Amino acid sequence: MTVRAVVFDLDGTLVDNMALHSRAFATFMERRGLPPLDAAQRERLDGKRNDDIFPELFGRSLPAAELRVLADEKESLYRALSQGRLSPLRGLDRLLALLEARGIRVAVATSGPAENVRHTLAEAGLAERLSLVVRGDEVPRGKPHPDIFLAAAARMGVPAGDCLAFE
């Protein structure tokens, strides 16, 4: 296999921010009178789109307007908690430089909403280097389906078989 492109997940892969997401979710759940997530629930929901998470948390289908309100509430908590606290994982700068030097294309594939993606990349100082981003709301099916990674490969103009994904 010749690697011509690399696709990275964002949260927990490029930036060590999963504890901040967990704290934001815990605060959200408490405010909404919901029981805390246990480890199995966190693992099952981790990496999924808000549109897939909230119906499961509330145990019912939710109209789009309500989904937006819930997602905005949770994600604004994350952005407030993470302000001034994000940096790339150790070794990422070196890895990106190596990929750039070898002409290997790079993209981000994330379930995060647009405002969080902009915030996280900017706070971590990665926005300039990682400008090709595919979000979960841009593909028919969220993770764990491969749609987001296939879309990233297509946007880079590279066959999926020539891509390496870090999730």
Language-model segments: which ranges?
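Active-site flanking residues adjacent to catalytic metal/cofactor-binding acidic residues
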Residues: 8, 166-167
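Residue-level signal for functionally critical sites in structured catalytic/ligand-binding pockets
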Residues: 18-21, 53, 75, 120, ...
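Substrate-recognition "cap/lid" segment bordering the active-site pocket of phosphatases
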Residues: 85-87, 107, 113-166
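N-terminal helical cap/lid subdomain that shapes the substrate entry/recognition surface
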Residues: 2-10, 14-93, 98-102, 115
